[in-house]
Design a protein with these regions (language model features):
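Short, intrinsically disordered terminal tails adjacent to the first/last structured region
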Residues: 1-23
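Cytosolic juxtamembrane amphipathic/interface segments immediately preceding
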Residues: 23-27, 31
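A structural signal for multi-pass alpha-helical bundles of membrane permease subunits
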Residues: 31-314
């Protein structure tokens, strides 16, 4: 007679209870307090001088506020509608875009050429670096007064040089066809040193093994420059172009000090127009509306550049 064996079911262990979160130690809490304490000055500065002015400006653009205090109530999008129909605003914006185009190209190309020449091993490199970069350290007022004297129709250096080769004098700052180019020449001389240093640093970071290998393959200087240097300088060039475009779009100092936007508004930038609308025309609300239109344009350009950069690197 066989006896049946019964096997007791195996006991399953109960799931472990979730451990309670460890209490924050006094030292950790103290570190958090110290972190917030050290961050507080920056946060206060950020809120007071960046966030609040943006909010205040956006609210102001929806009002008829003026320096005289009249018509300061909410008027909705009337300022924006007026700005989009303002021919002078569009002309000033066109001047700004034109200045950005004709100044960015030489500030990139000439800076690259100067950096390449210095990187070739010219003697007294410290002197070349100092010569090209030192104008960038000057104040805009100094540069503007210096070039205003050089552009003087009767006593200026440029017309004196033209007279020596038999060319009639040029009204550099009084001719609508020439005035913007005169401002661009001054701007290039003044700010090219910054781009020059960026390019020079990037060139000196390219490994010399690339050039040595190219020399062994029989590549000359020009071939090495276009096949090795330029591709390696791609990220630096993109950065310089972005910085230069954003800086040129905000041009104000040298134009206001050299031409005051003239002759006949031929050199008036959008920033100057915003300034005049607010502090000459006393229309702060209208000035704020134009500022936000301009801000939207800069934001679109910046986003387009970021998108193009990511698409290129992908």
């Amino acid at each position: 007679m066989s006896t049946a064996r019964t096997t007791a079911p195996a006991k399953t262990s109960a799931p472990a209870a979730k451990s309670a979160p460890a209490a924050t130690s006094p030292r950790s809490r103290r570190d958090n307090i110290h972190g917030w304490a050290f961050s507080a000055p920056f946060l206060v500065f950020f809120l007071l001088f960046l966030v609040w002015p943006m909010i205040s400006g956006a609210i102001m653009s929806l009002t008829g506020k003026s320096l005289t205090g009249a018509n300061s109530g909410i008027i909705g999008l009337a300022n924006y509608a007026e700005a989009f129909a303002d021919a002078d605003m569009w002309r000033s914006l066109g001047n700004t875009l034109y200045f950005t185009l004709i100044s960015t190209v030489p500030l990139v190309v000439i800076a690259l050429a100067l950096a390449a020449l210095v990187n070739m091993g010219l003697p007294a490199q410290w002197l070349w670096r100092l010569s090209f970069f030192s104008p960038f350290l000057l104040a805009s007022t100094v540069v503007s007064l210096f070039f205003a004297w050089m552009y003087n129709p009767e006593l200026g250096l440029f017309n004196d040089l033209l007279a020596k080769v038999g060319i009639p004098p040029v009204a550099w700052l009084n001719d609508p066809a020439v005035a913007m180019w005169a401002v661009v020449i001054a701007t290039v001389w003044w700010t090219i040193g910054f781009n020059f240093l960026l390019y020079l640093a990037a060139l000196q970071n390219i490994p010399q093994q690339h050039y040595e290998a190219a020399s062994l393959d029989g590549a000359g200087g020009w071939r090495q420059f276009f096949s090795i240097s330029l591709p390696q300088l791609g990220p630096t060039t993109v950065m310089i172009v972005i910085l230069q475009i954003l800086a040129s779009l905000k041009v104000f100092d040298q134009i206001y000090q050299m031409t005051e936007g003239g002759p006949g508004g031929a050199t008036r930038s959008i920033v100057q127009y915003i300034f005049e609308a607010g502090f000459t025309g006393y229309r702060l609300g209208y000035s704020a509306a134009i500022s936000y239109i301009f801000f939207g344009l800069i934001l679109l350009i910046a986003l387009a550049q970021v998108f193009a950069t990511r698409k290129r690197s992908a």
